[in-house]
Amino acid sequence: MTEPIIELKNIDVTFHQKKRTIEAVKNVSINIERGDVYGIVGYSGAGKSTLVRVINLLQEPTSGSVTVNGETFFQADSQDAKKTRIGTNDLRVRRRKIGMIFQHFNLLNERTVTENVAFALQHSKLKDDEKKAKVAELLELVDLSDRAEQYPSQLSGGQKQRVAIARALANDPEILISDEATSALDPRTTNQILALLKKLNQEFGLTIVLITHEMQAVKEVANKVAVMQNGEIIERGSLLEIFAQPKQQLTREFIETATNIDKAIETIRHEPLVNELKEGEIFARLSYVGETTDEPLIASLFRDFNVTANILYGNIEVLQDTPVGSLLVILSGEPTQVQTALSTLHDHHVEVTILKGGN
């Protein structure tokens, strides 16, 4: 097993505001391996942005330990314990290897695209001509070479975010933190930015920490996911595990935003076929991972049990090269045979949720 590039252990972040104490992050531990695109999902106030700001100590934790690239940035075993912290100058150097992009692009309005990207190189040891070449290379990477001398006011939201990405990459970081970077963008532009992030990960091995409230964004680029609520991680796993077998209600809610299966169920419930189920008919959801509900299995229900499957809706996602999907079906046949068919589906690792009928 490879050593994590980011290791957060027992992180607590507590804020004291007048007479209030706010526990923004509560005893969170997380390991992110080199080359991961790690999605951290949660609604506003869940603590996800506070947590990732701990990585480069923009937010110092109240307690816990922060290790990046095998180097301890911070350690305090409890709130009252003596703190060990990396020196200010050393931290400044290490931060150059951790790029960040945000929902608001934080560009300098009075500077051109080229000058905005070059700003990140002001403390670089590169010579002027090397800096110029570096900026040109970055603008080509984010497909903005033709906008080099324009100002932020002349750019679209997506173009501004591309400038921010180029600037974040200027010092050749090993880690890129994306904090709600697509939240202010339209769906088409969001997909373009996500595609760029995926390219950076795949072609350059960039480790990306993706903070978002949009499960669709996670689905597009992440290989691992953690779900946060009230300062805690309530569920984590590979993208495939989270989508195929969500354990928490909040996780299921997020997945619904990326699949719309619940919306399909509510719509189909009102169809005459479902409203007027006959004896021996069941309206059910079949959930599966892999090739377990390919056409021969569905067809075998009729061949082996004389049970027909009327498919009303299907949704299939390919996650980490594995099909994950749901079918909404009406199963019809003799009640005992329908039950036998359901058992057969279960034996083939198909999760069956009966939505109506079968009493």
UniProtKB/Swiss-Prot annotation:
Reading the lineage from the top rank, the first entry is: Bacteria
Residues bound to ATP: 42-49
Q: What is its EC number?
A: 7.4.2.11
> Where does it live in the cell?
Cell membrane
This protein's GO cellular component annotations are:
plasma membrane
Q: What class of enzyme is it?
A: translocase
**Main subcellular localisation:** membrane
Q: Which UniProt keywords apply?
A: Amino-acid transport, ATP-binding, Cell membrane, Membrane, Nucleotide-binding, Translocase, Transport
Q: Which residues form the ABC transporter domain?
A: 8-255
A molecular function annotated in GO for this UniProt entry is: ATP binding
Membrane topology for this entry?
Peripheral membrane protein
Q: List the disulfide bonds.
A: none
Which CDD domains does this entry report, sorted A to Z? ABC_MetN_methionine_transporter
Job of this protein: Part of the ABC transporter complex MetNIQ involved in methionine import. Responsible for energy coupling to the transport system.
For this chain, the family text in UniProt reads: Belongs to the ABC transporter superfamily. Methionine importer (TC 3.A.1.24) family.
Q: What is this protein called?
A: Methionine import ATP-binding protein MetN
